[in-house]
Regions:
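A charged, amphipathic alpha-helical module
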Residues: 8, 16, 20-117, 243, ...
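An N-terminal, globular interaction/scaffold subdomain
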Residues: 86-188
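Gly/Ser/Thr-rich loops at beta-strand to alpha-helix junctions
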Residues: 118-127, 198-205, 347-354, 436-443
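Redox- and metal-dependent alpha/beta enzyme cores, enriched for Fe-S-associated oxidoreductases
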Residues: 122-161, 345-419, 423
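Active-site and donor-binding regions of nucleotide-sugar-utilizing enzymes
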Residues: 144-235, 461-463
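A short, acidic, amphipathic alpha-helical segment used as a generic capping/interface helix at domain edges
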Residues: 180-186, 409-426, 443-447
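Proline-aspartate-enriched helix->loop->beta-strand connector
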Residues: 192, 422, 426-432
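C-terminal regions of proteins
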Residues: 406, 449, 453, 459-505
């Protein structure tokens, strides 16, 4: 019998992982509740008003269930790394949410705190504004759009339908459609002295920025990022854009960029990047210690939200020490899944509405995801020796942003990098997400299949619609994998209870 009830996905009881791991997991679960309760009690009246003002606020009430789904049946080092990362996310995000609501002019009209905030597109890492310590940077779409779409699969549906009712085509990528819907419904917090937009990750996001810009009604700087970002002849332009962005922020805030503080922040980011690359190196071994959806979710968070954050860096150091320990002691990490049949590379953008897909495919079919495309971003080491070299490194980091690091830049980053990762991680299976609303990658489907055949690599296609569970459900995604594993691979599941179930009403 599955731990979760059909349809709702509510757990019948907590996952049993053995005495030691169960107690640890329960302790971290209580720690999460402590973070959430502490956040709620700091501004109880304001938070209640926010729940009634913003539809997306309700999704944050389900965070404990979301974290439980991501941990799956993990134990040992993987469980500890997962829980530590997730609680770090909760700690940092609740602080940003508090700063946002305290400054929100929708909740407190004429709020003077609003002008102390730099509003910025979620695809731009906070490192860009690290030299402006008198102001707070808030990633505009992250709190009302991106994070709720991970936490609760139903959260985006209302806003996507609002966009379509307004006249946007139904085949638009759900990411810009969701953001446009939030703007139409006026559900973005009203904060900021200025707004930094960008042309990432795709053309759809550029178009939805125009709708957001109308709603924000703030002085706006469009930070334009070269599409051919791997070419050296585009870097002069990228650096000039970065300089212009910093000058714009100085003009709007009245604060001069502190280059010494920016340098310190860049050096912290460099250490974070080195620690991330160490995790990749551990995953290339025969016994990768850390897999699951929490890996790529934490990477997106640490690149955008948590870059240069001392709290995040301290967590990275602790997590890496835990993951290194079994190798230093000459033993294998905790076995997850219980039987490893395949080492897989996941390519293309994963489905937000099924963030724990990696846990399911591991526990049902023994597929160990050792490399996620969405995890491979922003690890450019920044040369801090001069201001110019620092700006160059900062520009390169921004260009290697979430999703677009592989979906923009040409054949070499979307196609050649895939085969390089298959070789590096010694993968025998590719899980290829077919994001049906993404027109760019869809054009390469035949090329992917042809090159996989030439190399003798198995490839399972999994159709999904990113943030819209009404188009392709979690169950439909699982069915595609089930059919492939049973008919093409001729395999039987590790756990038959996980093959087919209904979680249509689950968060």
């Amino acid at each position: 019998m599955r731990l979760e009830k059909d349809k709702t996905g509510i757990a019948r009881h907590r996952q049993w992982r053995g005495l030691k791991d169960t107690l640890y997991d329960y302790g971290q679960w209580l720690k999460l509740w402590g973070i959430l309760i502490k956040w709620a009690l700091r501004h109880p009246v304001l938070n209640v008003r926010a729940v009634f003002r913003y539809r997306w606020m309700l999704s944050y009430l389900t965070v404990p269930s979301f974290f439980d789904r991501l941990t799956g049946r993990m134990g040992g080092e993987g469980l500890r790394a997962c829980r530590m990362n997730l609680n770090t996310v909760a700690d940092v995000v609740t602080k940003d949410l508090e700063k946002t609501l305290v400054a929100d002019e929708h909740l407190r009209p004429g709020n003077p705190n609003s002008k102390k905030i730099i509003y910025m597109d979620e695809l731009i890492p906070k490192l860009v504004t690290a030299g402006f310590s008198d102001h707070v940077t808030i990633l505009a779409q992250a709190i009302p759009a991106y994070l709720p779409s991970l936490i609760n699969q139903h959260s985006p549906v209302h806003y996507i339908e609002a966009s379509e009712s307004y006249g946007l085509p139904a085949d638009v990528c759900p990411l810009p459609s969701l953001e446009a819907g939030i703007a139409i419904e006026d559900d973005f917090p009203k904060v900021g002295c200025c707004f930094i937009s960008c042309n990432m990750p795709c053309d759809g996001s550029i178009m939805t920025t125009t709708m957001q810009d109308r709603r924000f009604n703030l002085p706006t700087f469009p930070l334009n990022i070269p599409l051919r970002w791997t070419r050296e002849d585009t870097q002069e332009y990228a650096v000039e854009e970065m300089k212009a962005c910093i000058a714009f922020i100085e003009e709007q805030t009245g604060e001069k960029c502190d280059w010494d503080k920016l340098k310190e922040a860049c050096e912290r980011v460099n250490e974070q990047s080195r620690l991330k690359m160490e995790k990749w190196e551990l995953n290339r071994t025969d016994t990768p210690p850390f897999i699951g959806g929490s890996s790529w979710i934490y990477r997106i968070f640490s690149y955008e939200f948590g870059c240069a954050n001392p709290r995040v860096l301290a967590n990275d150091r602790k997590v890496n020490a835990i993951l290194r320990k079994p190798f230093e002691e000459g033993r294998a990490p905790y076995p997850y899944p219980k039987e490893v049949r395949h080492r897989a590379v996941v390519w293309n953008t994963p489905a937000n509405m099924y963030a724990h897909f990696n846990a399911w495919i591991a526990e049902c079919w023994g597929v160990q995801v050792v490399c996620d495309m969405i995890d491979l971003q922003g690890t450019q080491i920044i040369d801090t020796s001069t201001r110019e070299s620092m700006l160059y490194g900062l520009a390169k980091m921004v260009q290697g942003s979430t999703m677009r690091v592989h979906t923009k830049g040409g054949w070499e980053v979307i196609m050649n990098d895939l085969w390089a990762k298959v070789e590096e991680y010694r993968a025998d299976l590719i899980v290829m997400f077919d994001q049906i609303s993404c027109k760019g990658v869809a054009a390469l489907k035949g090329a992917f299949e042809e090159q996989a055949r030439e190399r003798g690599i198995r490839m399972v296609w999994v159709e999904q619609d990113l943030m819209d569970p009404t188009t392709i459900s979690r169950r439909t995604m699982r069915d595609q994998v089930n059919q492939y594993m049973q008919t093409v691979m001729g395999e039987t599941p590790l756990d038959a209870d996980l093959v087919d179930f209904d979680d249509s009403e689950a968060w």
